[in-house]
Amino acid sequence: MLGAIIGDMVGSPYEFHPWQGAAEAFPLFSPCSRFTDDTVMTVAVARGLMRAYGQEQACREAFIDAMHEYGRAYSRAGYGQRFFRWIVTGSREPYNSFGNGSAMRVSPVGWACDSLEETERYAALSASVTHDHPEGIKGACATAAAIFLARDGAGRDAIRDYVSFRYGYDLARSLAEIRPAYRHKESCQESVPEAIIAFLEGRSFEEAVRNAVWLGGDSDTQAAIAGSIAEAFYGGVPQDLREAALARLDDRLRGDVAAWYHWLSEHRGIRLDRKADPVQEQKTAVSATGRDIMETMPKAGMTGQWETTVEEGLLAAQVGSGEVRVLATPMMIMGMERAAMEAVRPCLPEDMTSVGTRVDISHMAPTPCGMKVRFEAKLTAVSANGRGLTFAVAAYDEVGPIGEGTHERVVVDREKFQSRAQTRGKHE
């Protein structure tokens, strides 16, 4: 929580007045540094968890109640127009937002939960009470997942690889590449990846926060997100920054912060007695969760195969790709695709699948009806975000090779992909 609060305060003076100098040159705290809606709603999420963690429906209601309660108590914290209307009207219905408010407040979830899957589930729950757009939910889940992984001991590469693969964010860019054209962005898809990159490029808690502010844009929220991940990664926050942040909170919020860390210790068995050093070396050990992620994500060398017997329905004369009774080229391609699917199927989450995007093959020999055929695929390259897959594919009948080439696939969210396809089907 304190990582997000410090980031919020450090970034607050620069939200609409971007810092133009070097990242290490601006003062972390100044007379203009203050807490904003990022801090208030982070505390609200923590309160919701303390009241009802373990009962998901009750926790959803607790999130709503706490957001209303704290939103009204701190009505001038700088909320977005739609969220403020949601607060003052007492609405309990979401409004399809994909703003980064869902990600800025989610950090307590990354600490409260016992597993990565539970973390993502509760992150979605905390987001969906207002930000029920898929991008709003994704931003919260990606942030909370990064926090959980960092807290669990995963290194930067494991965090980058998982978030890139699971949520499709491009984390291969550098801040130096992003900054020249970057503007004030408040959507999850245009600010959460950048905040995560700010953390990834930092070599200390302070550097992570400075990076997020130096980038420009929605600096307080980006720094809150980067700071929340950095707190988990470095095992706490530097003592001087902790004291400076607490001094800028009122008595109620200071009490809430203390209550949260006490709850983590007493009810979740998590202690943060050690404050992070100003500079800490990059982690070299890989956590069990990190190892699991790296072992299950698609990686070059994975293989798959599929076998069948050439029957009437696979013949060129039957499918319309020719007039002879041999294995049709489209059916050979289908077999190669099936083998490629089998190569990566075991490592994909249940809600994800792969779809073919390109084939470049040679059909070298005819295979008559009744003959057995075997299709093989080997994953030869994976894109930076883990979703673009290139395979070497081959086909064999009982005599020998009958086809070879390359095949490309992309990993997609099954439900979202199907929804887009149905939308195209309604086009007139």
Regions flagged by a language model, labelled:
Residues 294-328:
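Catalytic strand-loop segment that frames the active site of acyl-thioester-processing enzymes
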Residues 341-374:
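Hydrophobic beta-strand-centered segment that forms part of the acyl-chain substrate-binding groove
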Residues 361-398:
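Hydrophobic beta-sheet segments that form the core/acyl-binding groove
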Residues 313, 341, 380-384, 396-400, ...:
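Short coil/turn motifs at secondary-structure junctions
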Residues 403, 408-428:
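C-terminal output/interaction extensions
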Residues 299-305, 331, 358, 372-374, ...:
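Intrinsic-disorder/low-complexity, polar/charged segments enriched in Ser/Thr/Lys/Arg/Asp/Glu/Gln
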Residues 1-292:
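Structured, active/binding-site neighborhoods that engage oxygen-rich ligands
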